[in-house]
From Swiss-Prot:
Cofactor(s) required for function per UniProt: Mg(2+); Mn(2+)
Single GO BP term: isopentenyl diphosphate biosynthetic process, methylerythritol 4-phosphate pathway involved in terpenoid biosynthetic process
Residues binding 1-deoxy-D-xylulose 5-phosphate: 125, 151-152, 186, 209, 222, 227-228, 231
Record's keyword annotation contains Oxidoreductase: yes
InterPro entries, A to Z: DXP_reductoisomerase, DXP_reductoisomerase_C, DXP_reductoisomerase_N, DXPR_C, DXPR_C_sf, NAD(P)-bd_dom_sf
Assembly and binders: Homodimer.
Entry protein name: 1-deoxy-D-xylulose 5-phosphate reductoisomerase
Gene transcribed to yield this protein: dxr
Organism, scientific name: Salmonella typhimurium (strain LT2 / SGSC1412 / ATCC 700720)
Primary role: Catalyzes the NADPH-dependent rearrangement and reduction of 1-deoxy-D-xylulose-5-phosphate (DXP) to 2-C-methyl-D-erythritol 4-phosphate (MEP).
Domain of life: Bacteria
A Pfam family assignment: DXP_reductoisom
Its EC number(s): 1.1.1.267
Enzyme class, broadest EC rank: oxidoreductase
Binding site for NADPH: 10-13, 36-38, 124, 126, 215
């Protein structure tokens, strides 16, 4: 039986992870749950899965949780703060850590899991977007293992030869017969919206993803295709891919989750219903397979599968992310931080949808970027970029 810590248990990925556990009670045991401030959901999870530990972001939330659990006779020990989250990621009895805390808050707990030599089920994009080389070097040094949870990266992982799977981030794609990686994306809810109408799109419209059920921040990132840009950066690190070895395709149906092109003309693809439980279950059970709870793909009900190249005028955030990778880790860190602020401002109706890309670019142009040599350096770049972004939002929304 595999013992799990789930970082970000009350979020979308965390809840889907627990659903896979629910379908496979004899295969997985939840040792620790870590979350932000959603006390009610954490209480439900603790009462159902009886983890040894539960960690909340702050003492107030932890106290509320403690009272709720005591009322139900739960023996789960309640802790709070980032240090406690890092300790849960490095517990001796835990072998697998689901890293699903969104944003920069997930960096240190994920790094703690890596340094403890765990198998990390990586759903936190920011880990590689902001700390790609630092994290990949630490994975090798600590003999940890990264398994990608993102549906696209998981699809690529499944389509790669074992020689690359077992040397992720360092294997030479060309020497293993790989020509290129094809990263697919739906194009989001505004794929066919006239360009002149994009400025008027509302947060609720942006969050109506045509295929996937996701949180509001990542739904907006899908609408701008910043999500695909961050995935591009992540894929470059995970698969040791050069720019010429990466292709990005719009695939509106979200049936083919990504592909790998080989030197002999073969293309291997991973297909499935758009359900995050599939890649989650794959990483949890790898190299074996377990039931995910997802519906099987019915080929007889499929419509045509279509593909097109991305329009960078429609999706400037995608191009911005690709260019940031070439500038270095400081640029990708600053872009990610700025985007979190601008998306939050859009969701709060402080700026227009079309302002997101322009503000992100403005932050990059206003920063003197020095390459980070440590996680502390990364966090400093992150903090500065957020402050610059906040000032840009205030200036624009006056």
């Amino acid at each position: 039986m595999k013992q799990l810590t789930i970082l970000g248990s009350t979020g979308s990925i965390g809840c889907s992870t627990l659903d896979v556990v629910r379908h496979n009670p004899d295969s997985f045991r939840v040792i620790a749950l870590v979350a932000g401030k959603n006390v009610a959901r954490m209480a439900e999870q603790c009462l159902e899965f009886s983890p040894r530990y539960a960690v909340m972001d702050d003492t107030s939330s932890a106290e509320q949780l403690k009272i709720m659990l005591q009322q139900h006779g739960s023996r789960t020990e309640v802790l709070s703060g980032q240090q406690a989250a890092c300790e849960m990621a490095a517990l001796d009895e835990v072998g697998h850590v689901m890293a699903a805390i969104v944003g920069a808050a997930g960096l240190l707990p994920t790094l703690a899991a890596i340094r403890a030599g765990k198998t990390i089920l990586l759903a936190n994009k920011e880990s590689l977007v902001t700390c790609g080389r630092l994290f990949m070097d630490e994975v090798k040094r600590s003999n940890a293992r990264l398994l990608p949870v993102d549906s696209e990266h998981n699809a690529i992982f499944q389509s790669l030869p074992q020689s690359i799977q077992h040397n992720l981030g360092y294997a030479d794609l060309e020497q293993n017969g790989v020509t290129s990686i094809l990263l697919t994306g739906s194009g989001g809810p505004f794929r066919e919206t006239p360009m002149c109408d994009l400025a008027a799109m509302t947060p609720d419209q942006a969050c109506r993803h045509p295929n996937w059920s996701m949180g509001r921040k990542i739904s907006v990132d899908s609408a701008t295709m910043m999500n695909k840009g961050l995935e591009y950066i992540e894929a470059r690190w995970l698969f040791n891919a050069s720019a010429r070895q990466m292709e990005v395709l719009i695939h509106p149906q979200s049936v083919i989750h990504s592909m790998v092109r080989y030197q002999d003309g073969s293309v291997l693809a991973q297909l499935g219903e758009p359900d995050m439980r599939t890649p989650i279950a794959h990483t949890m059970a790898w190299p074996n397979r377990v039931t995910s709870g997802a519906q099987p793909l019915d080929f007889c009900k499929l419509s045509a599968l279509t593909f097109s190249a991305p329009d960078y005028q429609r999706y400037p955030c995608l191009k911005l992310a690709m260019e940031a990778f070439e500038q270095g880790q400081a640029a990708t860190t600053a872009l990610n931080a700025a985007n979190e602020i601008t998306v939050a401002a859009f969701l709060a109706q402080q700026i227009r949808f079309t302002d997101i890309a322009g503000l992100n670019l403005a932050v990059l142009e206003r920063m003197d970027l020095q390459e980070p040599a440590s996680v502390e350096d990364v966090l400093q770049v992150d903090a500065i970029a957020r402050e610059v972004a906040r000032k840009q939002v205030i200036r624009l929304s006056r």
